């Protein structure tokens, strides 16, 4: 079961993925998966949980644990404990990242429009990181708070709006990680943040990666990835693309030219008076046609 408030929210956008989506997603279940879903929900209800028991959420935890019901239950319970301890349920109201306009200059991270499958596209320019300047205006703790803030905004605002725009359930994002200009020292400087961010993503927001493009990858990066591929989950590997400096053609296969920023080979430009590429946050979640009962996505900072 879900709460009445959740029910009204879930009914405001599509709840099934398209038929060609991965097995184990809403609308694409076999009988064994349906049985596992019902079993997991019953176990969690019996344990006293009343929120986040919708099909989409529970199936993400099940997929993350290969439909092992007991392991999925443990993962869900650990996530709920973390949410309570971290204050995740109220972070969109409680946390304000007023230093974001400055941080965007030293570690650009932003969402911009959607890919051909309706996913919000997330850009992270890891090669442009300048930890020395970042440390003058923020801390790793606040950066991680902002990461969780963004995840909650994705779940509560971006994905529902993208689902309405696409006409089917959108559960994942498309990530573009740009390594242009990266050095061993700059990569090492943010390793602690990246490690913690990865832990949060994998354990508390499972199965949110739709496509992952690493562009401007240094020489040897692809070779190293091939060495590790046999140890990675095949489904995860199928979502990851390692590209060098000639990446535009591949990106345009997944992202319409009108949605891909000019700097990455597309045609999308953003007026600096509206925040520019880094701060404008353009997508269906800003379009009144696709905003539902949740309202427009909040801002973590003030543009004033």
Curated annotation (Swiss-Prot):
One of its GO terms (biological process) is phospholipid transport. Changing residue 266 to D: In SEC14(ts); temperature-sesnitive allele that is targeted to the proteasome at the restrictive temperature. PROSITE patterns: CRAL_TRIO (PS50191). Residues 99-272 form the CRAL-TRIO domain. GO terms for molecular function: phosphatidylcholine transporter activity; phosphatidylinositol transfer activity. Gene3D superfamilies: CRAL-TRIO lipid binding domain, N-terminal domain of phosphatidylinositol transfer protein sec14p. The inhibitor activity of SEC14 is controlled by whether PI or PC is bound to SEC14. The pPC-bound form of SEC14 is an inhibitor, while the PI-bound form is not. The phospholipid binding/exchange activity of SEC14 represents a mechanism by which the regulatory activity of SEC14 is itself controlled. GO terms for cellular component: cytoplasm; cytosol; Golgi apparatus; Golgi membrane. Pfam families: CRAL_TRIO, CRAL_TRIO_N. It catalyses: a 1,2-diacyl-sn-glycero-3-phospho-(1D-myo-inositol)(in) = a 1,2-diacyl-sn-glycero-3-phospho-(1D-myo-inositol)(out); a 1,2-diacyl-sn-glycero-3-phosphocholine(in) = a 1,2-diacyl-sn-glycero-3-phosphocholine(out). It is a peripheral membrane protein. Keywords: Cytoplasm, Golgi apparatus, Isopeptide bond, Membrane, Phosphoprotein, Protein transport, Transport, Ubl conjugation. It is found in: Golgi apparatus membrane; Cytoplasm. The modification Phosphoserine is found at residue 302. Its main location: Golgi. There is a cross-link at residues 42, 84 (Glycyl lysine isopeptide (Lys-Gly) (interchain with G-Cter in ubiquitin)). Required for transport of secretory proteins from the Golgi complex. Catalyzes the transfer of phosphatidylinositol (PI) and phosphatidylcholine (PC) between membranes in vitro. Essential for viability and secretion. Exchanges its bound phospholipid with phospholipid monomers that reside in membrane bilayers. Regulates specific trans-Golgi export pathways, like transport from endosomes to the trans-Golgi or transport from the plasma membrane to the vacuole at the level of the endosome. Present with 84300 molecules/cell in log phase SD medium. This is SEC14 cytosolic factor.
